[in-house]
Amino acid sequence: MPDWAVTRINTAIYDFLWNGKTELVKQTSCQLLLQHGGLAVINPGDNARALQLRWVPLIGDPLCSSEWVFFARYWIGLVLSRKIRSWAFLRSNMCPKYSGDSPPKYFTHILKAIDRLHIDLTLLPNYRVKTFYEKLTHPSPGRLPTAGAWERRLNTTLPWPDIWSNIYGGLSTNWEVDIAWRVAHGILKTRAYLKTWCRLNVSERCARCGITESFSRALCECTNVPQVWLWAFNLINNFFTTPLASSPTMIFFKHGFPSSDKRSIALAYVIINITLNEIWSARNVATFDKKQQPVVATVRKIKHRLRQRIRAAYNYNDLPVFNNTWGHKQVLCKVVNKTLLVLISFRYHIFSTSSTSYCTYFPQLRVA
C-alpha cells in the first residue's frame, strides 16, 4: 500500500474518531488493544503488510508448484534463504535466482515487512493475517504515561490492566463509557485542562463554583454534584450487602467494588457511567449557557436514561437473559406476567450534604 493511501486512510479514521478536532491521544496509543488503554484502531500500513506476508510461507514450501511462487523465488528467494534457515534449498543451483540488490518494488516491500517481524517465519504458531498483524504492530507498553500520572495524584497503585479492560464492554454502550476513557487518559476538556495543557486563553475557574475546574472538581465535588453521587450510590448499594462509599477511584476507574457479584458490578458500572455523562452535561449547560441545572433535574435525566436502556434491553433480549442482567435482584426492574415493571421511582429525595465529603480533591492532571 503506498504511503499516500496509508495517510489518507489514517486521516479519515482519526477525523471520524475525534470529530475533526485536535487528536488528544497519540495514534500509537489508540491502536493498542482495549486492555492496554487503546481503542484497537487498525493500522492500515501494518494491515497491508500482514496481507502480503500471508502468502510468503508458500515460497518456502518445496511442495508448492504455483507459478507465482517460482516467480517470487527468483526475485527474493536468495535473500529469504539467508533470513530463514530452513529455506536453504532456495540457494540451490537448481533454482534460478536474482542476485542483484534491486528487485521489483512489490518484492522489496515484502522483504521490508519480513524485516519488521524480527522473528523467523517458521517460529510463528500459524500463518494467519491476524498473527502477522500482531507481530508487526508495536509491542504494548507496560503502561501508558497517564497511569503514572494518576497514581502520583492519588498516591496509590492501581490495577491498570483490569481498569482498561473494564472501561468498554459490559452493559454500557460505547457512548456512555467514552467519558470514562477520556478521564482515564486525562484528556477531558475541563477548564484547567484547557488552560494548562492546550494553552488556551480561558479561565481555569469553574463556571458554577469559581474554583479551579479539575477532573475531580467537575465530576465529584462541584456545588450539588455530591448530592447526585449520593443518590446514585444509594441506588447502587441495593445490589451489595456491604454499603459502598464513593471515591474518585471508584467513580473514574470502577476500582474498589467487591469482586464476588459480577452481575451487580455490571449494573453499578452502568449507573456510574450514565451519572458521569449527566453530570458533565449539567457542567456544559452551566459553562456555555450560563444556566444552573438543579440536582432534581440531573437525577431525573439519569432515571430517564436508565429507563430507556432497560426498555431497550427488554425488547432486544430473551427473558432469561434480561432477568439475569438488568433484572438482577429486582432493583431496577422486574417482569411480572410478561409485563415489564421499571422500579426506578420518579420521586426524588433530597439528601443532606453533610455526609458528602467522600470526594478527596486532587490537582488537575497533565499527561504527556
Residue ranges and their predicted role:
Residues 2-15, 293-310:
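Short secondary-structure subsegments characteristic of cysteine-rich extracellular domains
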Residues 2-4, 167-173, 194-199, 263-267, ...:
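Conserved, non-catalytic sequence blocks in retroelement Pol enzymes and Pol-derived host proteins
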Residues 1-4, 28-32, 254-265, 286-291:
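Short, solvent-exposed helix-loop connector elements
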Residues 261-287:
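Short flanking/linker segments adjacent to small metal-binding domains or redox-active Cys/His motifs
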Residues 42, 196-245:
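Short Cys/His-based metal-binding microdomains
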Residues 9, 21-189, 310, 314-368:
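Extended C-terminal regions of large enzymes
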Residues 1, 54-60, 241-256:
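Basic, alpha-helical interaction scaffolds
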